[in-house]
């Protein structure tokens, strides 16, 4: 039985007490005894696991990042982060009372202790990081970890206020990535009727639309770009979508401007007052977090699970831990994993507004909340901060500007070299599919003015292309992630 309802009513002081207790126990009974990486790290750094008693004591433990999971000469390095108990380690690190209690519980259930421990720790499932910045890194799940995935999925269903008699449609790409499986397992845990189509790559947009109209789900879940594409396609065909009440988006940032555009398109198809939720997750945590219903396309922030993890916000330059509500880089520590375990993992994600506590102004839950204003540099680090025409720019600013122009239906930004010569000047081309009956000349000037004002960089060319060509350029129906910003510059 999940204790979520009780956890959402805890005070901030009680949350800290709970996390302190779980942190101390987890490190001493699971991480230090069974993790090859952390056993070696603690011994080399002379860290006594018994001295890790509170969240403040985490400062004794060094940060890790994705580079620590990837060994140039050791492609199996990720296995060092997997808990690997054996009979000797259990006898050495677990008190006899704990072993006897576990043995008694197994006996009462008609099981053998060895079998129960194997189910708890043995890897049986795997997902990968998406590999946009480095080689994909595998992360393992035991039966215990899959139960946690189920629980987090059911918690999100509760946050979305989806009832047991509602139907949902999972449009995330079918792949060994977190988003699809979080929805798949969460729906089962919540006893929901769910159709998982695998997204555009598996059934195609026509197939997904046919299924959507047949089962009439109250909620659909997927990548923002594909959900937008599917809803727009339904609008072109003149279909009624009044049965839709909730849209859940993941695997990419969701802005208020996007929510507004999607809401207007849904409203034109009969779907009025639809709640549009953003979610946040990453493979290393093997879970995701969600917003609760908020009016006017605002964000409640992502409701966290204080019994399952500790988050810190740090200064990305100095590593100093920041106060509640401060901006900084997000750092993740697991409190309840059995296979791949991360302590103080630097996500590379920068949060404006940090973490807040106290009752949520929308649902009243008292769980910690993470600001949804997140720049996911880890998604595209190689080009996110880039020099274009000699000016250092954050390419996410281009996305914010172009996505916020209502006259634009779809867009893509390409950075290239003149004549494809690596020693030539940079060129920036914006491909645009405008809304119907938009004056292209006026829109072109508006795009130039807004981009120059926000980034100090003006595009060399703005190309207007038809929607079907844009869909192919973005790979909306063929790739797991849209190709929104392309850096086509050849290396010198």
Go through the PLM ranges and name each one.
Residues 1-28, 32, 36, 190-492:
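Active-site glycine/GP-rich loop and adjacent strand/helix microenvironment
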Residues 136-140, 162-167, 194-197, 273-275:
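Short secondary-structure capping/junction motifs at helix and strand boundaries
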Residues 56-59, 149-167, 204-216:
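Conserved ATP-dependent adenylate/AMP-binding module captured primarily in the ANL superfamily
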Residues 129-130, 168:
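Hydrophobic alpha-helical segments that mediate membrane insertion or helix-helix packing
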Residues 154-190:
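Conserved AMP-binding loop of ANL adenylate-forming enzymes
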Residues 146, 173-177, 225:
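Short glycine-enriched loops at secondary-structure junctions
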Residues 1-128, 134-151, 155, 159, ...:
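Nucleotide 5′-phosphate-binding alpha/beta core
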């Amino acid at each position: 039985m999940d204790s979520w309802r009780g956890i959402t009513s805890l005070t901030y002081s009680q949350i800290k007490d709970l996390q302190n207790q779980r942190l101390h126990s987890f490190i001493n009974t699971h991480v230090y005894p069974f993790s090859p990486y952390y056993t070696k790290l603690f011994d080399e750094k002379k860290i006594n696991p018994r001295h890790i008693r509170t969240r403040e004591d985490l400062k004794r433990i060094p940060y890790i990042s994705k580079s620590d999971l990837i060994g140039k000469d050791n492609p199996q390095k990720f296995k060092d982060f997997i808990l690997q108990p054996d009979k000797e380690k259990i006898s050495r690190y677990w008190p006899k009372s704990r072993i006897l209690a576990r043995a008694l519980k197994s006996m009462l259930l008609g099981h053998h202790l060895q079998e129960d421990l194997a189910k708890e720790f043995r890897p049986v499932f795997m997902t990968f990081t998406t590999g946009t910045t480095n080689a994909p890194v595998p992360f393992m799940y035991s039966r215990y970890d899959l139960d946690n995935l189920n629980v987090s999925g059911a918690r999100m269903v509760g946050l979305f206020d989806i009832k047991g008699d509602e139907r949902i449609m999972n449009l995330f790409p079918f792949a060994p990535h977190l988003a699809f499986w979080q929805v798949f397992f969460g729906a089962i845990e919540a006893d929901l009727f769910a159709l998982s189509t695998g997204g555009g790559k598996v059934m195609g947009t026509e197939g997904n639309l046919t299924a959507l109209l047949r089962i009439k789900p109250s909620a659909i879940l997927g990548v923002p770009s594909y959900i937008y594409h599917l809803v727009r396609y339904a609008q072109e065909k003149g279909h009624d979508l009044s049965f839709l009440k909730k849209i859940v988006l993941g695997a990419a940032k969701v802005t208020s401007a996007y929510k507004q555009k999607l809401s207007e398109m849904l409203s034109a198809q009969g779907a009025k007052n639809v709640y549009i939720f953003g979610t946040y997750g990453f493979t290393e945590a093997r879970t995701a977090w969600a917003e609760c219903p908020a009016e006017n396309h605002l964000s409640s922030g992502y409701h966290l699970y204080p019994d399952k993890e500790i988050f810190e916000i740090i200064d990305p330059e100095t590593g100093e831990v920041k106060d509640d509500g401060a901006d900084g880089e997000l750092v993740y520590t697991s409190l309840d994993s059995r296979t791949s375990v991360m302590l103080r993992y630097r996500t590379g994600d920068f949060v404006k507004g940090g973490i807040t506590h106290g009752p949520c102004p929308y649902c009243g839950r008292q769980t910690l909340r993470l600001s949804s204003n997140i720049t996911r540099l880890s998604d595209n680090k190689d080009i996110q901060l880039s020099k274009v025409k000699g000016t250092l720019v954050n390419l996410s600013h281009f996305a914010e500007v172009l996505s916020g122009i209502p006259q634009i239906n779809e867009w893509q930004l390409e950075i290239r070299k003149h004549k494809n010569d690596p020693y030539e000047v940079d060129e920036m081309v914006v491909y645009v599919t405008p809304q119907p009956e938009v004056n292209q000349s006026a829109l072109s000037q508006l795009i130039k003015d807004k981009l120059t004002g926000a980034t100090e960089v003006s595009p060399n060319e703005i190309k207007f292309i038809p929607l079907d060509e844009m869909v192919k350029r973005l790979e909306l129906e063929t790739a797991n992630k849209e190709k929104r910003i392309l850096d086509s510059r050849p290396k010198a």
